[in-house]
Amino acid sequence: MDNKKIVLLIIFSTSLLFLWDAWVKEQEKFNAPPSVVAQANSAAGVTQSKNNDGLPIPGSELTASQTGSDLNGIPSSGDTADSVTPRLLPSGEQIRVVTDKVIAEIDTMGGDLRRLELLQQPSPEDENVPYSLLHSEASRTYVAQSGLVGEGLPNHKTVYQVESGIRNYELTAGEDKVVIRLLAPETQGVQVIKTYTFHRDSYVIDIGFEIANKSDATIRPFAYFQMLRDDTPPPAHTMMIRSFLGAAVYTDEEKYQKIPFDDLDKGKTDYPANANNGWIAMLEHYFLTAWLPPQQTPREYFAKRQSDNLYTAGVIVPAGVITAGETVTTTMPLYAGPEEQDRLAELAPGLELTVDYGWLTMIAKPLFRLLSFYHSWTGNWGIAIILLTITVKLLFFPLSAAGYRSMAKLRLVTPKLKRIQDQYKGDRQRMHQAMMDFYKTEKINPMGGCFPILVQIPVFIALYWTILAAVELRYAPFALWITDLSSPDPKYLLPVLLGISMFIQTRLNPTPTDPIQAKIMQIMPVAFSAIFFFFPAGLVLYSLVNNILSIAQQWKITKMYGTAPSQDAPESPASKDAPELPVSNQVINDSENTEAPASGPADSPKKPVNIPRRMHKRTRKK
């Protein structure tokens, strides 16, 4: 009865279930039938926000001309269609911007940010091509839109003109920022200029509106900023990657809250709408786009499904009260880039929570901090993982040592356990009782080797999510053929070495007395090795180093505590005279042909077997 092997079998079975679940969900995504969810307009009129210092939030009937409004006076991105494929948005002239971090394309149609390539993040299809975070294509849609709410004011359907006439901008040496100004047609005495400001060494883009009121009336416009995207997952370079895709909102009161696209399909709006702090974002694996309104500024967050499979998430803020002849500027920072945790924590409170560590965040965060510390020291994420593995191993050393000592003792008495099983193979209840009595007599805990494994399982899972979620490990090289620790080993050498290390470990463990368990233990190294073909190389590296350290520790402890006693050594009094196991002792002595001592009489009777009372009763019944 090898309980450690049972635990390993449970872990193996659970891993298979996770793989199956991931595969089924992935297939459902591709086989999902087309569906169109009807959307209702927001309530008519102007509503009052409870957290906006008395400033009104616009309703869907601001003007008669906004009959096509989708939310709070914001025009929808198009008519409803029956297709689940994103449409190609209307376009005008393209304005190209190149900085040290990004290549951006702004469309004069709506002044939308239609494309954003991250120069320091390779594409999963071709690592020589920058990753495209934003894009507007026939098959994929993910753009940043903005505009003003009010009669005749420009929105993301307005055609802008480039004020300077320049179509290509580049952040040159000595410049800290580059500014693009788009001029909207003047209507009803209101002139609006939309601005984009790109900064050096930053993924933050400031999008603003300069509103000049040349009329005689006072105006109270609102500005909206939204992300429009489809529900198509970004391309992944490993089948084991599955992370959250959808919107998220954060406020000081409600904290961090995810908004899955499925909830928007069902019309659920269980998220904080009105606040004067926080942010709203669109998330995908490794990357995000987030609107970051200034603190203590009244705002209304919104997220909903548009037509077909397009979704919006954004924020509405008041642009202020603009009297005749006055010019007001309102600006909204947009972060569009990788989920670099140190950078996110500096931008806005709670923004680092967008890094998805799953349900073991409390363990994963310290692991990543320690991993980052080792990386800052070594400059190599692979070496950092090895050092982290050694640290975790040292942390659990006392538990592991206790478990291995228990296994070493169990290895010594395995032949005796086998004889007990042979004696009671027709009566499982008596066999179990005899084995438990034997464990008690020999002071062996059969579960002693399982506890260290159970304790380390959460650490293993947390490290799995750390490696999957940390964009810092994306395309991070280790050595030789390992050029990306976040993707599987391209040559499968690490999984094979892991399987070999597991096989060596099984040879150090007590031989299972059950033939079925013995067969399973022979298969497990091969099965685990095959499963780890699809795991990130960084996780396989952790498991391999952990196994090597475990083998060294287990071999040393087995050598110290697991040496079999000499054939001439006298039998311990506990195993000889213990009343709990007289029958099994008798069987063991008989099988070893134990003879009476030479000093005693030749015809001296054998010592009677001291059978416990409960066994006498069973014998009489039988």
Curated annotation (Swiss-Prot):
UniProt-listed InterPro entries: Membr_insert_YidC (IPR019998), Membr_insert_YidC_N (IPR028053), YidC/ALB3/OXA1/COX18 (IPR001708), YidC/Oxa/ALB_C (IPR028055), YidC_ALB_C (IPR047196), YidC_periplasmic_sf (IPR038221)
Membrane topology designation: Multi-pass membrane protein
Transmembrane parts of this sequence: 6-26, 381-401, 451-471, 525-545
Subcellular location: Cell inner membrane
Chief localisation class: membrane
Gene Ontology terms, MF aspect: membrane insertase activity
Biased composition (Basic residues): 613-622
Gene Ontology, cellular component aspect: plasma membrane
A Gene Ontology BP annotation from the UniProt entry: protein insertion into membrane
Ranges for region Disordered: 47-87, 563-622
Alphabetical keyword list: Cell inner membrane, Cell membrane, Chaperone, Membrane, Protein transport, Transmembrane, Transmembrane helix, Transport
Segments of skewed composition (Polar residues): 62-83, 583-596
Described purpose of this protein according to its UniProt entry: Required for the insertion and/or proper folding and/or complex formation of integral membrane proteins into the membrane. Involved in integration of membrane proteins that insert both dependently and independently of the Sec translocase complex, as well as at least some lipoproteins. Aids folding of multispanning membrane proteins.
PANTHER family, alphabetized: CYTOCHROME C OXIDASE ASSEMBLY PROTEIN COX18, MITOCHONDRIAL, OXA1
Family from the record: Belongs to the OXA1/ALB3/YidC family. Type 1 subfamily.
Subunit structure: Interacts with the Sec translocase complex via SecD. Specifically interacts with transmembrane segments of nascent integral membrane proteins during membrane integration.
The protein's name in its UniProt record: Membrane protein insertase YidC
UniProt lineage: Bacteria, Pseudomonadati, Pseudomonadota, Betaproteobacteria, Nitrosomonadales
Gene that specifies this protein: yidC
